[in-house]
């Protein structure tokens, strides 16, 4: 029989049921405190536009502020404007509902055990996200030009083989459309270049319209008025106008395989030679800081003094297959490139779109080098989709 002392010890050694062990209480997330709109606008204006799609998921009020004119006015006053990339994909010819995407930062889902996973070399953490399709939809095969935060679209096909003279402006701050005065002629896939506050629109006509007095239409952005520029000694059998660019004070225009150059200061047209048109005509192209670039089987830039194309060496870019679709764009003084990876199997229903940003360096007047800052897969789409537009705006 146990002694009373042992019993007491047993009793005293038992835990008091009324005294419970404190449990670790995980902190309950608190709602975002209500801040004045003007303070939120000031905060958002200092954040990169790449994060806006993520911030817009927080609440309706955030979404409203992120699309407000006041936010972008504040960004401009603070000197926080930046380039923003857009990509348009189409399916079919014409496609009544093309898909529009913009580049943004991925939500950070790389946390594991409280630590970030190491990102792969050359990765940026970016991806393409869809933006609402504007209503009414944009015409297929329209020409385009970016001016500040706006993208101007000229002409295109309303339906198969029916050209349009419609001009539409996409406001990339709010992703809304507004109409502008129509072209004086119906055009499909015209070339457009921005020069000193005006947009020069050329091409997109053929047949009986090819020798019209309106081969080039000029739109004054400030007054919203159209004018035109005739091309002297243009012969109809030269071919169609298909490319344009403004470089070194001259407006270059391809007519078939010929290239004409218009000197704005002297108001004079000259032949620019055949060499310029050979690579330019069959490739995607863009102008970056007064230099014309193109990509066909290699990256090239045009030397206006020697009037010839030179190959640009690019360091760090994966080798592109010959059958890939490629688009290049001016991305704040750098080159952005989109390309699609060919499907390894004919049975594949999707393909991957990749993006790279290339920093450009000109060590002397005879060379330009490219160095890839990052490249990665940014979107997966059905194989039936093709590139239509790739460009950047300033927001």
Curated annotation (Swiss-Prot):
Q: Please identify the protein, giving its name as recorded.
A: F-box/kelch-repeat protein At4g39570
| Lineage top rank: taxon | Eukaryota
Can you tell me which residues the record assigns to a coiled coil?
none
Does the keyword field hold Metal-binding?
no
Query: Which key words are in the record?
Result: Kelch repeat, Repeat
Question: Compositionally biased, Basic residues: which spans?
Answer: 1-25
* Residues annotated as domain F-box: 29-75
- For whether the record's keyword set contains RNA-binding, the answer is no
Which SUPFAM superfamilies does the protein's record reference? F-box domain, Kelch motif
Cross-referenced InterPro entries: F-box-like_dom_sf, F-box/kelch-repeat_ARATH, F-box_dom, Kelch-typ_b-propeller, Kelch_1
Q: Where are the Kelch repeats?
A: 150-197, 198-246
- Disordered: annotated span: 1-29
| Pfam families xrefs | F-box, Kelch_FKB95
């Amino acid at each position: 029989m146990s002694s009373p002392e042992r019993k007491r010890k047993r009793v005293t050694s038992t835990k008091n049921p009324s005294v419970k062990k404190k449990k670790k209480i995980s902190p309950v997330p608190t709602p975002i405190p209500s801040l004045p709109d003007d303070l939120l606008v000031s905060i958002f204006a200092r954040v990169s536009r790449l994060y806006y799609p993520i911030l817009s998921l927080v609440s309706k009020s955030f979404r409203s502020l992120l699309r407000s004119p006041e936010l972008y006015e504040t960004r401009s006053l603070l000197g926080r404007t930046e380039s923003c990339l857009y990509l348009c994909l189409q399916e079919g010819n014409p496609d009544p509902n093309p898909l529009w995407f913009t580049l943004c930062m991925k939500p950070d889902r790389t946390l594991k055990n409280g630590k970030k996973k190491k990102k792969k070399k050359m990765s940026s953490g970016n991806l393409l996200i869809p933006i609402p399709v504007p209503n009414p939809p944009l015409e297929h095969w329209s020409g385009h030009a970016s001016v500040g935060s706006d993208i101007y679209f000229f002409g295109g096909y309303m339906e198969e083989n029916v050209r349009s003279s419609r001009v539409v402006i996409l406001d990339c701050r709010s992703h809304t459309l507004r109409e502008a005065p129509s072209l004086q002629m119906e055009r499909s896939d015209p070339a457009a270049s921005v020069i000193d506050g005006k947009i020069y629109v050329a091409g997109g006509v053929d047949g009986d319209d090819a020798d019209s007095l309106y081969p080039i239409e000029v739109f004054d952005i400030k007054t919203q008025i159209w004018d035109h520029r005739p091309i002297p000694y243009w012969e109809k059998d030269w071919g169609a106008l298909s490319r344009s660019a403004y470089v070194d004070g001259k407006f270059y225009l391809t007519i078939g395989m010929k290239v004409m150059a218009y000197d704005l200061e002297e108001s004079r047209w000259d032949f620019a030679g055949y060499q310029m048109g050979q690579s330019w005509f069959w490739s995607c192209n863009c102008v970056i800081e007064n230099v014309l670039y193109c990509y066909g089987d290699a990256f090239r830039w045009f030397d206006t003094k020697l009037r010839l194309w030179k190959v640009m060496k690019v360091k760090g870019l994966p080798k592109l297959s010959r059958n890939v679709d490629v688009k290049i764009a001016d991305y704040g003084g750098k080159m952005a490139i989109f390309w699609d990876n060919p499907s390894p199997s004919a049975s594949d229903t999707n393909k991957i779109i990749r993006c790279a940003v290339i920093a450009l360096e000109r060590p002397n007047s005879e060379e330009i080098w490219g160095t890839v800052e990052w490249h990665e897969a940014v979107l997966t789409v059905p194989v039936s989709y093709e590139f239509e537009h790739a460009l950047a705006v300033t927001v």
